[in-house]
Amino acid sequence: MPRRFDVIVIGGGHAGSEAAYASARLGARTCLVTHRRDTIGVMSCNPAIGGLGKGHLVREIDALGGLMGRCADAAGIQFRLLNRKKGPAVRGPRTQADRKLYRQAVQNVLFNHPQLEIIEGDVFDLNVENGTVKGVILADGQSLPSASVILTSGTFLRGLIHIGQTKIPAGRVGEAPSLGLSATLGRLGLRLGRLKTGTPARLDGRTIDWAQLEMQAADEQPVPFSFMTDRITNRQIECGITRTTAATHTIIRDNIHLSAMYSGQIEGVGPRYCPSIEDKISRFGDRDGHQVFLEPEGLDDHTVYPNGISTSLPESVQKEFMRTLPGLENVTILQSAYAIEYDHIDPRELSASLELKRLSGLYLAGQINGTTGYEEAAAQGLVAGLNAARTAGGQDVVHFSRAQSYIGVMIDDLISHGVTEPYRMFTSRAEFRLSLRADNADMRLTPIGIALGCIASDQEKRFKDYRHQIDDTINMLETRKLTPNEAAAVGIPVNQDGRRRTALELLAYPDISIADLSRLWPELDALDSKVAEAVEIHATYAVYMDRQNADIAATKRDEDRLIPKDFDYASLSGLSNELKQKLEKTRPENLSQAAKVEGMTPAAISLLIAFLNKGMLRHVG
């Protein structure tokens, strides 16, 4: 009798690790199937976590009890808060990470979870019965039954590495691709596409002349990702900065016909916001140089990652142009750069739970959905893991709104618009970024996590204490009032208009802090620094939030107006045949998604609302 699981996760990358951990936290009997146990949690490309938009996702994962934030804190060796001089809404926490420490941190959690079993193997096929996935079939013929399956294949689906004219079937360097699953997905009639990403060469740091380079230090006060991290204990390092030169550009231009991207050898589309050095030279040829960050990959590792210079040129050309960069005149390349193509599905095939609309029981997360980046993959893995476990347990799935989280923004973008290139998160993608800040991810999402049961007891207790302190402080500041003269007497300048202001109103002034107010109310001196910062940010944005809250409420109303799954759009009179076909193809779950269908007009939405209001939609039978 084969072992039976509630949830099987295919793949042990960032999406798979987060999915397996989320499922196991909910108590589901979870199995993670991966080619090699020792590669779970590996950082396949850049040795960094977070950044603009991406750091918000990591904070949200942590607020829901996930892995990535804690593991990044355990492995971080150069913490920097990006956009520090700008408003809190667009600040992005980031760290360079020690690859070995990060992998160990992920594995320490997963290997020791009682609800999680890890199996080494190659999933060759899915067991599908009557339109429902019932488990997986391994390449050795073994069948593993389960209630839900999560596919997190990364770049492994028909993965093909390109170095110049050389092609190597692989999911990443040294690991075989997954061929059977691509065939299965195609056989099931899913819309597949081809995308491309790339990674730069790895350099031997002992052969770099660091004395020539500008050095970038870590922040003096590291800002952790995880709510549960009190302080960063790793030694913090510097990274070097160099630039391409005219000689670099000449070599690349002279050999660009040998690039896999420019020879027509690659059919997949690459990420717009992480272009190869060939793209940079072709598209921005008038620049005198392009910045390259030399990022050490570990505290006891001499490998260096040259961020900003990915390529698919031949190895000989890579060596030639690399040595034209200042500081790299004698550099040794440890691993050549390469581009990799892989299959993905059209994410419009998915519901907001990340389950396939036409194949129940199968959830997808990560690069298979058309995204790029560790953080985007991990966030999807978390959602898929929670929903697969809840479905297996007979519970309703959970949806994350774009008004509630960057996770919701990303998923809504994917399932509403699909992708024509690898999708990357930016703060500019969110309409409600004043309220979707990295600093308040816990306040937005941890209560949801507590209700779902995916928050550990120590995190729940700490969060409730933290929220209680913030609420008490805000309430206190709302009850304390000052006249302009009283404020001026303690060095707090305000307009001399005679109006009494609350302490919270005063705190909204850009030059007034909790420390200033503590001259009047010394009890504020005792506030925890995180609580004080949270209260200051709350005061800063409070005046802007009324209008945004009204917009958020309108968005939520549209998201809450569900459209029956079996609605026959052909019967909806008043719409063009083209729009009916698009609605039939995308099958939006609610009004918010329907409004994003290409060609949808305000008149068409009004017609759909009228049908909903009049009860003319055919009910699910």
Swiss-Prot record:
InterPro entries found in the cross-reference section: FAD/NAD-bd_sf, GIDA_C_N, MnmG, MnmG-rel, MnmG-rel_CS, MnmG_C, MnmG_C_subdom, MnmG_C_subdom_sf
Domain of life assignment: Bacteria
Positions annotated to bind FAD: G11, G12, G13, H14, A15, G16, V123, S178, Q367
Keyword Cell membrane: no
Organism: Allorhizobium ampelinum (strain ATCC BAA-846 / DSM 112012 / S4)
Binding site for NAD(+): 270-284
Cofactor(s) recorded in Swiss-Prot or TrEMBL: FAD
Keyword Lipid metabolism part of the UniProt annotation: no
Pfam families, per database record: GIDA, GIDA_C_1st, SAM_GIDA_C
Description of how the protein assembles with itself and partners: Homodimer. Heterotetramer of two MnmE and two MnmG subunits.
SMART domains the record matches: GIDA_assoc_3 (SM01228)
Molecular functions per Gene Ontology: flavin adenine dinucleotide binding
Role, per record: NAD-binding protein involved in the addition of a carboxymethylaminomethyl (cmnm) group at the wobble position (U34) of certain tRNAs, forming tRNA-cmnm(5)s(2)U34.
Keywords, alphabetical: Cytoplasm, FAD, Flavoprotein, NAD, tRNA processing
Protein's name according to its UniProt entry: tRNA uridine 5-carboxymethylaminomethyl modification enzyme MnmG
Gene3D superfamilies assigned to the protein according to its UniProt record, in alphabetical order: FAD/NAD(P)-binding domain, GidA associated domain, C-terminal subdomain, tRNA uridine 5-carboxymethylaminomethyl modification enzyme MnmG/GidA
Compartment(s): Cytoplasm
Chief place where the protein resides: cytoplasm
PANTHER family xrefs: GLUCOSE INHIBITED DIVISION PROTEIN A, PROTEIN MTO1 HOMOLOG, MITOCHONDRIAL
Family in the record: Belongs to the MnmG family.
Record GO cellular component, one term: cytosol
GO biological process: tRNA methylation; tRNA wobble uridine modification
